[in-house]
Amino acid sequence: MISSEAMPFASTGGLADAVTSLSSALIDNGHNVKVLLPRYYGISRDILTLFDGQLCCTNKIEDIFVSVYTASIQTQKNNTLEFYFIDYEKYFGRDGIYGTVDNPNYDDNPQRFSLLCHSTFQLCRELNWFPDIIHSYDWPTALISVLLKFYERKNPEFSNTKSILTIHNLGFQGIYSKHLFPTTNIEWKYY
């Protein structure tokens, strides 16, 4: 699962509950599930464990190195649900998940959540864990399906991986200027 929100760590509404509830139910039914989300400013590093090494996510301008943290919770059947947090201060070390009260949408949200999506594949490689399905939620993680189809499926480890996108709130579509598209590290032909 990849999401911008998950309980009990980051929430603005029902999305966080849905992500954690579904992940927990799948774990309790014998599936191997991991949840990936950003380590926002409001998620204290004190409650997380630093994962060994950094991930390198290359965009067209620079190599971005992100730290990864982990945490876990117990499900209703006392199974362990693992969470992985992408930590990059420039994008996620600020108040608010998507923006602030005065500015509800950060101007760099496309870059922020693109980094999260690109990090997904790097983290899977680092864990040597290649899921059957990558389930993404809402516009912040919708890029996963594009990355999988046009880039990652060429790699043998993701050749059988499928993607699911669940929309929880159609009112938030992540519509930004097309001039920001290159910052997602996706070729123009896919615009």
In which residue ranges do the predicted regions lie?
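Catalytic cores of nucleotide-sugar-dependent glycosyltransferases that transfer UDP/GDP/TDP-activated
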Residues: 1-191
